[in-house]
Design a protein with these regions (language model features):
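Mid-domain alpha/beta scaffold segments of enzyme catalytic cores
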Residues: 1-177
């Protein structure tokens, strides 16, 4: 976003009562960009995490840099968006299984980091709710710090989150009904 456009967006938001934003980081380029925005605008906050759709063979190298963002004078407000996405998998079962395994390993590594940082966590879960819950349970993170972003599951899954102390957020997807 060019500065004039960003300024206009911030002004329009302010005029209707929106006074702060959280930019959700999904890959290394986002983290750097959003941290810079957050440094320039006191009402813009950011998160850092590797989104499951960006998990590739080099995910370990990317993820190892995330905790360093918390050592910065302007740290993220949450770890995420992290999670599992089983929606767009290849038809080839072997390739599909490789992607799922990589996403699961990456999620577990990031949950361990988030637990060590004792920070809030934003979860991306698409066609993978049960696995996400299982890995969060296994990680031992505080469920009260977990929010399932862009929640698209049913009432039973929402009750499951609430039972554990987790939360769900609803975005434009709530209008799809």
């Amino acid at each position: 976003i060019e500065n004039n456009t960003l300024y206009e967006v911030l002004e329009r938001a302010r005029s209707v009562g929106v006074d702060s934003f959280i930019t959700v980081g999904t890959n290394p380029e986002d983290w750097t960009c959003y941290r810079a925005l957050s440094q320039s605008y006191k009402n813009i906050y950011y998160t850092a995490g590797l989104h499951p759709c960006y998990v590739d063979q080099n995910w370990r190298k990317q993820v190892e840099y995330i905790p360093a963002y918390w050592n910065h004078a302007n740290p993220p407000v949450s770890f995420g968006e992290i999670g599992l996405d089983y929606f767009r998998l290849p038809k080839d079962k072997s390739k599909s299984n490789d992607i799922i395994k990589r996403q699961q390993d990456c999620l577990c590594a990031q949950l361990d980091m988030a637990k060590a940082l004792d920070c809030p966590i934003i979860i991306h879960s698409r066609n993978s709710f049960e696995d996400c819950v299982k890995f969060i349970d296994q990680s031992g993170v505080d469920w009260q710090k977990v929010v399932f972003h862009c929640f698209s599951e049913g009432i039973n899954q929402l009750m499951e989150l609430n039972k554990r102390g987790g939360r769900a957020s609803f975005t434009g997807n709530i209008t799809y009904i």
